[in-house]
UniProtKB/Swiss-Prot annotation:
Biological-process GO terms, alphabetical: cardiac muscle contraction; regulation of muscle contraction; sarcomere organization
Residues modified to N-acetylserine: 2
Protein name: Troponin T, cardiac muscle
InterPro entries the record matches: TNNT (IPR027707), Troponin (IPR001978), Troponin_sf (IPR038077)
C-alpha cells in the first residue's frame, strides 16, 4: 500500500469518528430537553390539581395516567467538508513509484551482471596465469630430470670404465706375479725353507697377510678432479659398509654372549636341582 492510500484511509476514519461524535452529542442534547419539558409539565399539572381541590373541595382521587412514548428530536449529522482525493493523481504517483523501483532493480541487475563479468574475466586470467606457471614448472622439472638421468649415465659409464681398468690392472699384476714366479724361484725356496724349519705363522702374521692381500693399490695419479671425487665417494661408501658390518657383528656377538650366559645359568640351576633331589632320595632310603 502506498502513502497516498494510507492518507485516504486515515482521512476516512477521521470523518467516521467525527460523525459518530456529532450523533452522540445530538442525542444527549435531545434527551436533556425532553427530561426538562416533562418535569415542567408535571409541576404545572400538580399546581392545577391543587387549585381545583382547594376550590371544589375534596374529590375522589383520580388514577395517574401513563406517560406517552419518548420521542427525541433527531438532527441529521453534518459531514465536514474535506479535501477531495484525486485518484488519477494517486494512480500516477503509484505508477511513478513502481517505475522508479523497476528502474532501480534494472540498474542493480546490470551492476551485478557487470561485477560478475569482471569477476569471471579475472578468474579466467588467474586460471591462465596458473596454467602458464604449471607449464613452466613442468618444463623445469623435466629439464632437471633429464640432467639427473644424464649425470647418472655418466657416473655409471665412469664406474664401469674404472671397474674394467681395475680388472685389467689386476690381470696384469697376476700375470706379472706368475712371470716372476716362473723366472725366479726365490719364493719357492723360501717356502721350502720355512716348511723345513717348521716355523709356524702367528695369528698376527696371518692377519697382516690377509690385509696385505685385500689392500689394493691406490692409483690416483692419472685421475682428474671429478674422478678423484668419485673415488673418495667410493672409499667413503666402503668404509661406511665396513663400519656397518662391524656394528652388526658386535651386536651379534653381544646377543650370542647373552644367550650363552642365559644357557649357562640354566645349566647351573638344573645341576643344583638335580643334586638336591638326589640327596633327598638317599636320606629317605636310609631312613
Amino acid at each position: 500500500m502506498s502513502d497516498v492510500e494510507e492518507t485516504v484511509d486515515e482521512y476516512e476514519e477521521q470523518e467516521e469518528a467525527a460523525v459518530e461524535e456529532h450523533e452522540e452529542s445530538v442525542e444527549e442534547e435531545a434527551g436533556g430537553e425532553a427530561r426538562q419539558g416533562g418535569g415542567a409539565s408535571a409541576a404545572e399539572d400538580g399546581e392545577e390539581e391543587e387549585g381545583r381541590e382547594a376550590e371544589d373541595g375534596p374529590v375522589e382521587e383520580s388514577k395517574p395516567q401513563a406517560p406517552g412514548p419518548f420521542m427525541p428530536n433527531l438532527v441529521p449529522p453534518k459531514i465536514p467538508d474535506g479535501e477531495r482525493v484525486d485518484f488519477d493523481d494517486i494512480h500516477r504517483k503509484r505508477m511513478e513509484k513502481d517505475l522508479n523501483e523497476l528502474q532501480t532493480l534494472i540498474e542493480a541487475h546490470f551492476e551485478n551482471r557487470k561485477k560478475e563479468e569482471e569477476e569471471l574475466v579475472s578468474l579466467k586470467d588467474r586460471i591462465e596465469k596458473r596454467r602458464a606457471e604449471r607449464a613452466e614448472q613442468q618444463r623445469i622439472r623435466t629439464e632437471r630430470e633429464k640432467e639427473r638421468q644424464a649425470r647418472l649415465a655418466e657416473e655409471r659409464a665412469r664406474r664401469e670404465e674404472e671397474e674394467s681398468r681395475r680388472k685389467a690392472e689386476d690381470e696384469a699384476r697376476k700375470k706379472k706375479a706368475l712371470s716372476n714366479m716362473m723366472h725366479f724361484g726365490g719364493y719357492i725356496q723360501k717356502a721350502q725353507a720355512e716348511r723345513k724349519s717348521g716355523k709356524r705363522q702367528t695369528e698376527r702374521e696371518k692377519k697382516k697377510k690377509i690385509l696385505a692381500e685385500r689392500r689394493k693399490v691406490l692409483a690416483i695419479d692419472h685421475l682428474n678432479e671429478d674422478q678423484l671425487r668419485e673415488k673418495a665417494r667410493e672409499l667413503w661408501q666402503s668404509i661406511y659398509d665396513l663400519e656397518a658390518e662391524k656394528f652388526d657383528l658386535q651386536e651379534k656377538f653381544k646377543q650370542q654372549k647373552y644367550e650363552i650366559n642365559v644357557l649357562r645359568n640354566r645349566v647351573n640351576d638344573n645341576q643344583k636341582v638335580s643334586k638336591t633331589r638326589g640327596k633327598a632320595k638317599v636320606t629317605g632310603r636310609w631312613k
